Amino acid sequence: PKQYHPKLVSLAPSFGIRVWGIANAILFAFSNLVKTTRYTRESFSYRKFLGKYKRMYTLRLPYKSYEKSRNVDIKNDYIFFLSTLWYNDEWNKNNEGVNKTRANFIRACKDIKTIDFEGGMVSSKLSQSSNRLFADCLYHKTIAMKTWLYKTCKSFVVFNTPAFWNCHGWKLAEYLTLGKAIVSTDLSNDLPAPLINGVNIHI
């Protein structure tokens, strides 16, 4: 309700990082599992619970990795952009929104002969029905997070657009952390401090 809007606090964009090393990740995973099973009455999946700790360690990097990556030399004719091809249905209409916007950027980069473009959209089982529409924009390789970070830092510009359900994706926060030159479509949500067109973002 609108009368409660003044009480709402806008959150800053954020992204996942590796919080602990392997030993502490295992320790906290199982100690928190014991606490959860002891105090909750609801049934839950042990596999999903422990899987979150596994993904935190295997798929994310420590914050220090982002700080160190700021020193990577930028290649002035190189653009790297890798993103998710989200599944589409009658409610989210991602093929008319985020998927289409990302595809337009990818196609524009590929059409500019003086740009060395690398990347695309990564499909999943859920988004198979959209593959045909964006076949020319799909990326079929798997890369490590360290590689993604290095190539993103090497890119002379990065691209941002509101993601699933118009949320601020992790990439916006990662780009800001890395101090990248950001090209973006209009932001869909308020921020604690606005990003100003022509100052810290180009919309």
Identify the function of each model-found stretch.
Residues 153-155, 176-180:
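Conserved donor-binding/catalytic loop of nucleotide-activated donor transferases
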